[in-house]
Amino acid sequence: MNFEDQEEDMEMSGVNPPCGYDSLSGEGATSSGGGGVGRSKGVGAKIRYRECLKNHAVNIGGHAVDGCCEFMPSGEDGTLDALKCAACGCHRNFHRKETESIGGRAHRVPTYYNRPPQPHQPPGYLHLTSPAAPYRPPAASGDEEDTSNPSSSGGTTKRFRTKFTAEQKEKMLAFAERLGWRIQKHDDVAVEQFCAETGVRRQVLKIWMHNNKNSLGKKP
């Protein structure tokens, strides 16, 4: 599912996006940086995009999220890929928006467009709703999920789990610590060489570093 399809889903649900909605053209109230962090224009506030709230079971009247904990842009600022999460493949507006003011207090911006509208039922009837899917934490350090883009038909996202050998995990850990758990532009040559030597794709390495930097990364 591309960005246009995702925005059409929000329109078809009959609910307007929350304030601060960022369109594909990039004309929004905020601008984002790497790691789901941005700064609002004209206001000294930092913006973060936290867990993904997209409802993948809206077509069957249920509620299920993918477990992505924080937005991570797939591309550089100013590109369409910058609005797409590299971890879950969803548009940035599906992630919970959190604004941190100068004083350091976080303000959560509510998101309304992820839960499907409930059909009206006359009083006196038992109202049944589908149970929410249990929270699924990010993949452990031994395995990593490489998420493909959702199909245009709106079906469930396919996930392919990548298995790493002990040698690959050891090399990725050492390489991630050397880069400071973040791939920057000047690291492209080293990353390409590392991927060629280990057989791990760049995108898989990037997602692995994102999911494991808090659990495996050295404390400052």
From Swiss-Prot:
Disruption phenotype: Arrested at early embryo stages. Keywords: DNA-binding, Homeobox, Metal-binding, Nucleus, Transcription, Transcription regulation, Zinc, Zinc-finger. Its main location: nucleus. Residues 157-220 bind DNA. The keyword Amino-acid biosynthesis does not apply. Residues 1-40, 100-160 are annotated as: Disordered. Mostly expressed in flowers and, to a lower extent, in inflorescence, stems and leaves. Residues 1-11 have a biased composition (Acidic residues). The record marks 209 as: Required for DNA-binding. Pfam families: ZF-HD_dimer (PF04770). It is found in: Nucleus. One of its GO terms (biological process) is embryo development ending in seed dormancy. Gene3D superfamilies: Homeodomain-like (1.10.10.60). One of its GO terms (molecular function) is zinc ion binding. A zinc finger (ZF-HD dimerization-type) spans 49-98. Residues 31-40 have a biased composition (Gly residues). One of its GO terms (cellular component) is nucleus. Essential protein. Putative transcription factor. Homo or heterodimer. Interacts with ZHD1, ZHD3, ZHD4, ZHD5, ZHD6, ZHD7, ZHD8, ZHD9, ZHD10 and ZHD11. This is Zinc-finger homeodomain protein 2. The gene is ZHD1.
